[in-house]
């Protein structure tokens, strides 16, 4: 985690800018990665455990093959994510996630994902940030995307217990 701490500038809601991008991540989809994910998800369907070239991966593999990587977005903006700052670190709790699939991910694909800040907003005094992760294959076809929303600040006076 120390690699993510680039300075003491905290990536708080007021400095987050929509459009901020993180780094790209490219991964090969192999029979082994499909089987490992299926096993980890406790889905022992032979379709995934014994997948061969050209066969489909589980749809939810998008969350492993295209992880959120908020830390890289914070770093690209010159800040440190709140979860890893040295003093007074804190979580930004999950609020919701919406995923959309456009094409299947298959054994033999090369998947590249990139995340960016989609929007930030205030709702009833609480402050939210939505991130979008987009996944494309080796043909530059978008295979999936998901929006992941976190609560950066709770409304003042809200009882959190």
Language model features: what each stretch is:
Residues 1-96, 157-161:
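Hot-dog-fold acyl-thioester-processing enzymes
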Residues 1-17, 96, 101-161:
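HotDog/MaoC-like acyl-thioester-processing domains
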